[in-house]
């Protein structure tokens, strides 16, 4: 077996040490050590990178490959210490030469961080003797073709609350024959003796045997030359290609990350990194090798190539580290990426359901039972088991599928959103009447008892402008509440409804004349009927123009979204000019004061059972004879699966004398679903899938632009049918890298970004197929299309004639297809002549201009992402390559000539640009900007070793080999072959030095793919303006994408880990499968675009967002103390930096929690008032957090007259397992017995009151009388957290709801019911108060504490996983 030595280097930066809540003052330091899998022979070397700052009296050092940070002293609370220690860990690995990439990706790297402390200066003399107090182990998910670039704040345990911020950069830096010896583990013998490590000298393996395989036998020099067999030659070629490809992929990933950093942070000091296109460089290296036949020359050439690539990689790695090391901007950028990924991951297995407020009083036994069953199903489901890890994760603080809690949230609001209209334009309506909804049209067949599906906004910029959770409103009700919108209802598959939203267009004044820039005038006088009033609002019966119901189809990307088709609609009496028109600029709902027209932008998603032919007939039968032109409709899911869902984009524009609008969009099919939506993140398209540009809105500034779009669509349809290639919607071919969200997948992914990027790429690996019948029927439904094209005769007369033949081919082909379609569609199903056929002549006559048709090549996308003039839109790579390969090298270097090629390649001719039959055999990727691509094409320049660079390369290689030699010399002093190795190395280096400029070799079988030189979607620079209300930090796009942990499958280079892709896809598939099988009317937080936390812990700049103080009072429970809620306080402070929070950790009752509630209430209110007066606080809001018994004390405080002044400042009440209804119906005999004994022993008044034994008359008991007093309704949010695993506090008591036993109890049950009504009826009556209940299923070990219910009772206090998940996903929003 041939073996290869690979070297991976990790650069680890310790930035800051944050004292969150350490108990002891003294001296601390952190130790870092790296571990690799013991099953892979390896050698580890740890070094410190140059220290520039004064390290103090106790500098950092390295001892036995463990790096000790400098010693620092902690004296104050919330103290931050700058560490800024940088260390490098080089890992030399002995790998299987036949599967180098797989072997490298299978190495389990673990970074161990230990916190050591001493308060004795005597121990500082020997740092190794300082005791360990806490430790964390981080898993590093490294892949050689993408590297690892991540930042993570590591929090130590509960008793040592502190954080060390760590940045890790990792990259493959070398592959070559083994040069050092490795210790190999030996299995223990059968006698039971411990295994001993056996050192084997691998350097004895000759280079020839590595290259040609074990079958090769080098003859003695006396026997002459030996010709190796064909198998040996092929082995050499493959061995060379695999290693070179891996090194080139690592080089490309490193260069790409470096370029992305500079794009995001252009002010960084940096060195230019030479680009090496992976495919072309690899092809040239392989072709050069294949020209050689002598085995010695082959071996020498392979050694040269590997040495050259190693040198390039080492230089790039050093330049990269110089650029990013200890740079605050880079740290902040990576910090945001990690936080977004982590929050998104926590949002999995977090459900929410909305109910009407009166339902809070009902007995929801079925809901509780379904949540319990679902929790068990999730624990055993593939969905949770397939949850991918973060790029760098710590199981203790990040959790895994086996430890993450499952949470169900029940919201009780004025208008529950089980079916949504989520339009960001309506996020903050001017008044509640602006949210209007239509009744179902009598013309539609509705299914009784069925539920409409969701309606979601898809305007270009809306998904990026989440100022707060969008307004969602239940269909057929006029109401609005705040909260996340997207969701899924799995009962919807069995039921469907056909609700109808019909547009009403009020006739507008006709201007005297409206002419376009080209002189074309468009008259829409054919329609003369007004629309019937169908759309109404319950509260205000006024017209809702612009909202038209159209049946739509589900997206191939996300089954809960819809493919979009835009209808250009106009009304009689309105003269609309398409030239010189603009789309409405406002993203919000606007009212035109002149004509009363209102603009709506949304997609109506409904489950329907009709076909698209029914859709057309429905449109024809509408009384509103508006001119609706469906330019192109999607038939994707009908061709892939039998679906009953359709989608359509509906657009109604305000039209007056001065404003003219033209909108175009279409829903073209994506044969290969490159994106599997996860967690609500707008997923990015694959690098080889057609970007969903047609699902976005585009502005057409002239008639010719509209015709161009028609031509492009028709061309796409023709080619797709000609090729007849279809790919599975659930599986992706090799090389496709879908994205999930991370971070882009992250909540801030904007839909406009997807549209902008689609202008840079066009892949034919996912051919587009549209139904010709539907498209033409829709086109011929209207005269407008004919008039538009007819007007082109005038406007095209000014165009250049050199492209006339190309454009004429378009028109001829389209005309022929239309004629053939008309032949089939002349008669309808009942034999009568189709009324649309009469439009054929108008359409055909207007379709073909005279001879001036130079509109095609002049069309240019206005791409905000690419500001440079030499960037270009959708181009087939094959066309570019063919054009460029036909030119000489000098022309290739000429950028002006290149742009001419691009212009021609961008033109849309009638002939296919590529052979469609070869589509599936060709790999495509994102097209980089033109300048970058053409600079890459001079292959000879890209891979040559210029004389100026030889010296620096020699130096880097000499240093590398000298280091290897030093390592070997230290380990094995008796080694005798070290000198010979250095001689061999020197000979190799001398060969590199004398290497002349590489001559050009004919590129044979050059792949079209140039993925490595192209920018991935995930790293595209974002130039769109920041939208008000949307966090700028949230708008950041991650620098890199990690294969195993970023909740997305990236496209950084052509060799991205397929195993990682499969893992991501398997997770999405498991999630989709789980959704389909789910019998629960709820929604996942992971499907929401915006979650509660968008700012990472310890941001570089904390902006005070509030004027006054937000006082948070934390009250412990029975037999507790003020430190019980430390973690709650910690995660609130970390999650809301700049929120101006002031915490009062109540301690007045910690000495006696067995007193009665009145006494404890007096102490707490005294403590609150004294705290405010002592610190002279200017209170703007007050929130309470109580655990167990503390929740009752808080409610009692609210009833006291002394607190009356603060009632109007109450904000949130967070109840953690609070026995609001006492312990009357506790189902734990053990707990009841324990409480009885404790009450007897302690003479506890509070326990007596909790058990309703403080008075013989239940209605005179403390808890009953407390329920009659006002309190909860003064809060904005009442959040009740409970767990059925908690046996200390009854589940129903913590949630303030009925229980089954109470309904059967005729004596105590009515009193129990009255208590619930007393508590909740004021909450229902208060419009400003929202009640939220949480049902938490903890992942608890099988211990005695779990058995008696104590573990779940205290888990809400000391479980980092629960608290972080709860606050980051939803809880922080209640304190904002």
Swiss-Prot record:
Under the heading Pfam families, the entry gives: DUF3657 (PF12394), DUF676 (PF05057)
Tell me the segments the record calls region Disordered: 431-489
> GO terms for biological process?
lipid metabolic process
Comp. bias regions, Polar residues: 443-462
Q: Which residues form a coiled coil?
A: none
InterPro entries recorded: AB_hydrolase_fold, DUF3657, DUF676_lipase-like, Lipase-like
Q: Where is the composition biased (Acidic residues)?
A: 431-442
Top-level taxon: Eukaryota
Q: Which family does it belong to?
A: Belongs to the FAM135 family.
Specify the protein name.
Answer: Protein FAM135B
Q: Give me the gene this protein comes from.
A: fam135b
């Amino acid at each position: 077996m041939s073996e290869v030595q690979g070297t991976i280097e990790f650069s680890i930066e310790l930035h800051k040490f944050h004292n969150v809540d350490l108990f002891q003052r003294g001296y601390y330091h952190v130790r870092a050590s790296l571990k690799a899998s013991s099953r892979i022979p390896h050698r580890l070397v740890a070094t410190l990178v140059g220290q520039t700052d004064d390290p103090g009296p106790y500098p950092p050092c390295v001892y036995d490959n463990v790096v000790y940070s400098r010693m620092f002293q902690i004296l104050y609370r919330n103290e931050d210490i700058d560490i800024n220690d940088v260390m490098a860990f080089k890992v030399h690995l002995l790998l299987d030469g036949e599967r180098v990439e797989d072997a490298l990706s299978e190495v389990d790297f673990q970074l161990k961080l230990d916190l050591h402390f001493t308060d004795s200066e005597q121990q500082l003399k020997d740092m190794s003797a300082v005791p360990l107090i806490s430790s964390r182990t981080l898993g590093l998910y490294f892949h050689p073709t993408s590297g690892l670039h991540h930042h993570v704040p590591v929090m130590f345990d509960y008793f040592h609350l502190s954080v060390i911020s760590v940045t890790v950069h990792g990259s493959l830096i070398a592959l070559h024959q083994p040069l050092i010896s490795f210790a190999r583990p030996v299995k223990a013998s059968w006698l039971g003796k411990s295994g001993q490590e056996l050192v084997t000298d691998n350097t004895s393996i000759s280079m020839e045997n590595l290259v040609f395989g074990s079958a090769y036998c080098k003859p003695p020099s006396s026997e002459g030359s030996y010709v190796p067999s064909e198998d040996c030659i092929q082995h050499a070629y493959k061995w060379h290609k695999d290693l070179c490809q891996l090194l080139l992929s690592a080089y490309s990933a490193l260069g790409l990350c470096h370029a992305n950093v500079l794009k995001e942070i252009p002010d960084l000091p940096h060195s230019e990194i030479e680009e090496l296109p992976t495919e072309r460089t690899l092809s040239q290296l392989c072709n050069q090798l294949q020209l050689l036949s002598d085995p010695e020359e082959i071996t020498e050439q392979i050694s040269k190539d590997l040495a050259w690539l190693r040198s390039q990689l080492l230089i790039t790695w050093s330049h990269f580290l110089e650029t990013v090391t200890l740079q605050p901007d880079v740290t902040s950028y990576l910090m945001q990426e990690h936080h977004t990924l982590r929050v998104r991951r926590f949002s999995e297995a977090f459900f929410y359901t909305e109910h009407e407020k009166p339902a809070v009083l009902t007995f929801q036994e079925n809901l509780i039972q379904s949540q319990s069953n679902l929790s068990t199903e999730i624990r055993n489901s593939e969905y949770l088991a397939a949850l991918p890890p973060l790029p760098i994760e710590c199981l203790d603080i990040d959790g895994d599928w086996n430890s993450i809690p499952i949470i169900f949230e029940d919201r009780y609001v004025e208008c529950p959103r089980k079916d949504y209209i989520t339009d960001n334009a309506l996020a903050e309506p001017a008044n509640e009447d602006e949210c209007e909804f239509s009744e179902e049209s009598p013309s539609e067949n509705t299914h009784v008892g069925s539920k409409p599906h969701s309606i979601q906004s898809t305007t270009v910029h809306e998904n990026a402008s989440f100022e707060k959770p969008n307004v969602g409103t239940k269909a057929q009700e006029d109401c609005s509440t705040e909260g996340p919108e997207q969701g899924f209802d799995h009962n919807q598959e069995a039921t469907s409804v056909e609700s109808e939203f019909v547009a009403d267009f009020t006739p507008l004044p006709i201007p005297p004349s409206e002419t376009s820039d080209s002189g074309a005038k468009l008259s829409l006088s054919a329609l003369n009927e007004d629309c019937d009033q169908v759309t109404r609002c319950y509260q205000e019966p006024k017209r809702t123009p612009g909202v038209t119901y159209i049946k739509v189809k589900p997206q191939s990307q996300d089954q809960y979204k819809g493919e979009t088709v835009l209808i250009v609609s106009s009304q009689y009496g309105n003269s609309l000019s398409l030239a010189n028109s603009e789309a409405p600029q406002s993203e919000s709902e606007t009212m035109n004061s002149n004509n009363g027209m209102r603009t709506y932008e949304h997609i109506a998603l409904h489950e329907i059972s009709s076909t698209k032919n029914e859709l057309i007939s429905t449109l024809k039968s509408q009384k509103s004879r508006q001119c609706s032109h469906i330019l192109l409709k999607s038939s994707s899911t009908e061709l892939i699966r039998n679906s009953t869902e359709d989608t359509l984009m509906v657009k109604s524009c305000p039209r007056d004398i001065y404003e003219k609008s033209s909108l175009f969009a279409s829903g073209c099919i994506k044969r290969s679903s490159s994106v599997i939506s996860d967690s609500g993140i707008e997923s990015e398209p694959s690098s080889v899938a057609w970007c969903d540009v047609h699902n976005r809105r585009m502005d057409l500034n002239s008639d010719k632009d509209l015709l161009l779009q028609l031509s492009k669509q028709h061309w796409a349809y023709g080619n797709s049918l000609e090729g007849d290639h279809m790919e599975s919607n659930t599986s992706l071919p090799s090389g496709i890298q879908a994205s999930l969200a991370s971070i882009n997948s992250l909540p801030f992914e904007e839909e406009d970004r997807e549209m902008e990027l689609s202008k840079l790429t066009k892949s034919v690996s996912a051919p587009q197929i549209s139904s010709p019948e539907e498209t033409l029927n829709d086109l011929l439904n209207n005269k407008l299309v004919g008039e538009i094209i007819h007007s082109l005769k005038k406007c095209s007369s000014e165009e250049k004639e050199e492209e006339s033949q190309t454009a004429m081919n378009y028109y001829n082909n389209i005309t022929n297809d239309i004629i053939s379609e008309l032949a089939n569609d002349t008669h309808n199903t009942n034999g009568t002549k189709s009324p649309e056929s009469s439009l054929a002549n108008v359409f055909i006559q207007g379709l073909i201009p005279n001879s001036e048709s130079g509109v095609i090549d002049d069309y240019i996308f206005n791409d905000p992402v690419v500001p440079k003039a030499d960037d270009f839109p959708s181009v087939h790579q094959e066309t570019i390559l063919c054009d460029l390969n036909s030119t000489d090298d000098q022309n290739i270097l000429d950028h002006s000539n290149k742009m001419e090629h691009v212009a021609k390649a961008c033109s849309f001719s009638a002939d296919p640009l590529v052979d469609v039959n070869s589509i599936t055999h060709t790999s495509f990727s994102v097209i980089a900007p033109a300048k970058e691509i053409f600079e890459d094409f001079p292959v000879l320049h890209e891979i040559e070793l210029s004389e100026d660079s030889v010296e620096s390369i020699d130096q880097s290689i000499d240093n590398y080999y000298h280091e290897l030699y030093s390592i070997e010399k230290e380990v094995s002093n008796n080694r005798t072959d070290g000198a010979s190795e250095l001689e061999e190395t020197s000979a190799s280096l001398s060969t590199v030095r004398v290497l002349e400029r590489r001559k050009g070799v004919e590129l044979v079988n050059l792949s079209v793919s140039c993925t490595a030189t192209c920018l991935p979607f995930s790293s595209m620079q974002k130039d769109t303006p920041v939208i008000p209300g949307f966090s700028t930090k949230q708008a950041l796009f991650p620098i890199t994408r990690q294969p195993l942990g970023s909740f997305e499958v990236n496209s950084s280079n052509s060799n991205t880990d397929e195993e990682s892709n499969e893992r991501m896809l398997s997770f999405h598939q498991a999630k989709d499968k789980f959704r389909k099988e789910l019998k629960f009317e709820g929604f996942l937080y992971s499907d929401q675009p915006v979650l509660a936390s968008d700012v990472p812990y310890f941001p570089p700049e904390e902006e005070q967002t509030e004027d006054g103080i937000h006082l948070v009072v934390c009250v412990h429970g029975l037999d507790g103390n003020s430190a019980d809620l430390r973690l709650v306080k910690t995660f609130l402070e970390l999650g809301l930096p700049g929120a101006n929070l002031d915490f009062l950790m109540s301690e007045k009752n910690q000495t006696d929690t067995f007193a009665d509630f009145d006494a404890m209430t007096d102490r707490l209110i005294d403590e609150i008032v004294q705290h405010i007066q002592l610190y002279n606080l200017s209170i703007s809001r007050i929130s309470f957090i109580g655990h167990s018994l503390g929740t009752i004390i808080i409610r009692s405080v609210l009833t006291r007259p002394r607190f009356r002044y603060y009632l109007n400042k109450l904000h949130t009440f967070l109840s953690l397992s609070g026995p609001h209804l006492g312990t009357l119906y506790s189902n734990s005999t053990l707990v009841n017995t324990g409480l009885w004994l404790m009450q007897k022993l302690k003479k506890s008044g509070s326990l007596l009151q909790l058990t309703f034994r403080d008075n013989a008359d239940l209605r005179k008991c403390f808890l009953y009388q407390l329920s009659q007093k006002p309190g909860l309704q003064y809060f904005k949010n009442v959040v009740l957290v409970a767990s059925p695993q908690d046996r200390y506090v009854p589940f129903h008591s913590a949630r303030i709801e009925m229980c089954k036993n109470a309904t059967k109890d005729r004596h105590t049950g009515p009193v129990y019911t009255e208590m619930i009504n007393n508590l909740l009826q004021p909450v229902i009556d208060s419009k400003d108060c929202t009640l939220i209940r949480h049902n938490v299923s903890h992942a608890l070990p099988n211990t005695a504490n779990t058995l008696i219910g104590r573990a779940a009772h205290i888990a809400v206090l000391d479980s980092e996983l629960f608290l972080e998940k709860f606050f980051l996903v939803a809880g922080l929003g209640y304190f904002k």
